[in-house]
Amino acid sequence: MRIMGLDVGSKTVGVAISDPLGFTAQGLEIIKINEDKQDFGFDRLAELVKQYQVDRFVIGLPKNMNNTSGPRVEASKAYGDRIEELFHIPVSYQDERLTTVEAERMLIEQADISRGKRKKVIDKLAAQLILQNYLDCNY
């Protein structure tokens, strides 16, 4: 059983994968997307799905702190709907409030990574945190 976690943004999708037993999440990569050009990185996702034999996706939902949904929640759900259509693999959603903040804090405090380097890995780490939270709550 492999679960793929996604942190869907307007310019990038952070990707993480679980270990085969579903205990831990590891960040994989960041896929560049372009919403204006309808380029959502599905070709690369297809390669990763095949490579890791994914049988579930977990997509982070960026809810507001008061638990309301904003436009990015709708965009994330639309992305999930499209994934289900394309790959015929179930999609679950995980509250991702503050995961990017937590990821940035980890990179600053624990890894002492410069701002430029943080931008290159933060979405991947956020996807890892989203997936790990899902695994901790469900397995």
From Swiss-Prot:
CDD domains per UniProt: YqgF
Subcellular location: Cytoplasm
GO biological process, one term: rRNA 5'-end processing
Ribosomal protein in keyword set: no
SMART domains tied to this protein: YqgFc (SM00732)
Enzyme class, spelled out: hydrolase
One Gene Ontology cellular component: cytosol
Gene Ontology MF annotations: nuclease activity
Entry EC number(s): 3.1.-.-
Sorted UniProt keywords: Cytoplasm, Hydrolase, Nuclease, Ribosome biogenesis
InterPro entries in the cross-refs: RNaseH-like_sf, YqgF, YqgF/RNaseH-like_dom, YqgF/RNaseH-like_dom_sf
Pfam family, one: RuvX
Family: Belongs to the YqgF nuclease family.
PANTHER family the record matches: POLYNUCLEOTIDYL TRANSFERASE, RIBONUCLEASE H-LIKE SUPERFAMILY PROTEIN
Function noted in UniProt: Could be a nuclease involved in processing of the 5'-end of pre-16S rRNA.
NCBIfam families: RNAse_H_YqgF
Name this protein carries in UniProt: Putative pre-16S rRNA nuclease
Organism: Streptococcus equi subsp. zooepidemicus (strain H70)
